[in-house]
Structures are given as structure tokens and as C-alpha cells.
């Protein structure tokens, strides 16, 4: 719970982490550092049309849901 901090910043960070997991950029970064440019196992998937569950619809949850809608995701929310 961080009521004094920017809900949008937290929601954007959450989306960045979701994209990192989705597109496997953390693995790609490590491979490039090892001079391995193979794409094996690095293909992610599109978020558009996927359903994402959000637990908590306070200020941060609402900001995150707005971002997800921008990516074309369907949202299931629980508060």
C-alpha cells in the first residue's frame, strides 16, 4: 500500500514487468551479453485480445486497467 506515491507510476512499472515476462526481454538481454543471438525460446505472444486478471481496483488497479485497455486486453477485476 503506497497511498502517497503516484498510482500511474506503479501501474506503468507493473505493465513494464508484464511486458518483460511476456516478451522475454530479460533472457534476450542476458543472451546478447553472452554473444548468443539465437531466437530459440524467446518468442512471446500478443497481449491484444488476451484476458488479464487484476486483484484490487483502487487507484493503482484502475490505472493499470486503463493501460491494459490500451493494449486491447480484456480485464477481469476483483476488489
Say what each PLM segment does.
Residues 40-79:
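Rossmann-like dinucleotide/phosphate-binding beta-alpha-beta segment
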Residues 31-39:
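A short, charged, Gly/Pro-tolerant segment at domain boundaries
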Residues 2, 10, 32, 52-54, ...:
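Extended aliphatic helical segments
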Residues 1-29, 41-44:
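Phosphate/diphosphate ligand-binding glycine-rich loop within oxidoreductases
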Amino acid at each position: 500500500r503506497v497511498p502517497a506515491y503516484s498510482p500511474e507510476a506503479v501501474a506503468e512499472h507493473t505493465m513494464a514487468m508484464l511486458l518483460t515476462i511476456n516478451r522475454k526481454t530479460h533472457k534476450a538481454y542476458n543472451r546478447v551479453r553472452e554473444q548468443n543471438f539465437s531466437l530459440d525460446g524467446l518468442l512471446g505472444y500478443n497481449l491484444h485480445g488476451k484476458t488479464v486478471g487484476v486483484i484490487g481496483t483502487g487507484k493503482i488497479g484502475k490505472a493499470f486497467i486503463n493501460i491494459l485497455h490500451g493494449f486491447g486486453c480484456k480485464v477481469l477485476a476483483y476488489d
